[in-house]
Amino acid sequence: RLLDDTPEVKVLGAVADAIETPKAEPCIDLDVAGEATFAREDDLPDYVLYAEVTFHEICRDGGSESEGKNGSQMRLIADVGPESATVAK
């Protein structure tokens, strides 16, 4: 799943692997810029390990809807684990 060996992408890979997508086919994607796409908004993790990541695109109902163009970005910031995580929209 990793497209690059940079630490940022490795961190995002761990985050993506922690997300369960029981419905349909997940559209989790990573690019070299360190961005991630999740299958559903509900799939956003409760925590992000050692990373500050901006999620700019959320796929819904089998379709892809780019929310970054509307300025509706979601940033998840965490310290070292789920207990110290904060989520800001």
From Swiss-Prot:
Designated name of the protein: Tuberculin-active protein
Lineage of the species this protein comes from: Bacteria, Bacillati, Actinomycetota, Actinomycetes, Mycobacteriales
Keywords of this entry: Disulfide bond
Other remarks in the entry: This protein is the most potent component with tuberculin activity so far purified and characterized.
Disulfide bond positions: 27-59
InterPro entries found in the cross-reference section: Tuberculin
Annotated function: Tuberculin is the soluble, proteinaceous cell substance of the bacterium, to which infected animals become hypersensitive and react characteristically to dermal injections.
Annotated organism of origin: Mycobacterium tuberculosis
Pfam family, one: Tuberculin
Region Disordered: start-end pairs: 61-89
